[in-house]
Structure formats: structure tokens, C-alpha cells
Amino acid sequence: MIQSFTRLAVADNSGAKELMCIKVLGGSKRRYASLGDIIVCSVKKALPNGKIKKGQVVKAVVVRTKKEVQRANGSLIRFDENAAVILDNKKEPVGTRIFGPVGREVRYANFMKIVSLAPEVL
């Protein structure tokens, strides 16, 4: 459950380390984002030699949330941190590697490139 001003870790090697959610995309009254949702973020911490710089405004897809997500079969999935993967204008990941597991809901949201790069899909 990601909303405005939520801080997220970055799960790729784009150069950014921490993001802050500015807006949840998908309607003017939409308040929360979950796994597989696209959000607009500001980069709060970044590596000095990375592709993404501090202060940049980027779009990202949520791949891990601390708030549990209920699946269709009744099971719940939750992670230890909130994390996102930074996207370019074509909704492809900016980084070439993904760190940590990603939720299966990312696959249902048609982010196949992220799913194929991820070491584990839960």
C-alpha cells in the first residue's frame, strides 16, 4: 500500500537508491498503489555515477510492499520492504538487473521484462 510521500527502495541498478512517491497513477481519486501499479516518484538518494540523478522525477512500478496482498486463492504475500523498479517512457526498466524477489502481480500487469530479469518471482 503505497501513497504520496511513501519512501521506497530501488530494486534495480539504475543508480537511484531511494524514491519518494509523488502520485499514484490511474485516476484522480486513486490513493493507494499495490504490486504492479505505476507511480510517479522523486529520486531522494542516488549514486554519483548512475544513470538516474538525485532530484529527478521518474515513473516506477511497485514490485514489493510491506502491506500484505491477498491472492485469488486466498493466500497472502508480503515483503520486508517497499521497493520499486524505475521505468523509461516505453515502460521498460532503466536498469539491466533486478535485485530481490518480485510479486507475481507484476507479471499480471504485463511487465514481462522485469519478471524475466528478477532472480525470484513469488
Curated annotation (Swiss-Prot):
Cellular component annotations (GO), alphabetically ordered: cytosolic large ribosomal subunit
Protein task: Binds to 23S rRNA. Forms part of two intersubunit bridges in the 70S ribosome.
Gene name as annotated: rplN
InterPro entries tied to this protein: Ribosomal_uL14, Ribosomal_uL14_bac-type, Ribosomal_uL14_CS, Ribosomal_uL14_sf
GO biological process, one term: translation
Pfam hit, one: Ribosomal_L14
Coiled-coil boundaries: none
Assembly with partners or alone: Part of the 50S ribosomal subunit. Forms a cluster with proteins L3 and L19. In the 70S ribosome, L14 and L19 interact and together make contacts with the 16S rRNA in bridges B5 and B8.
Annotated source species: Campylobacter fetus subsp. fetus (strain 82-40)
Similarity comment: Belongs to the universal ribosomal protein uL14 family.
GO molecular-function terms, A-Z: large ribosomal subunit rRNA binding; structural constituent of ribosome
Name of the featured protein: Large ribosomal subunit protein uL14
NCBIfam families for the chain: rplN_bact
Keyword Zinc attached: no
Entry keyword set: Ribonucleoprotein, Ribosomal protein, RNA-binding, rRNA-binding
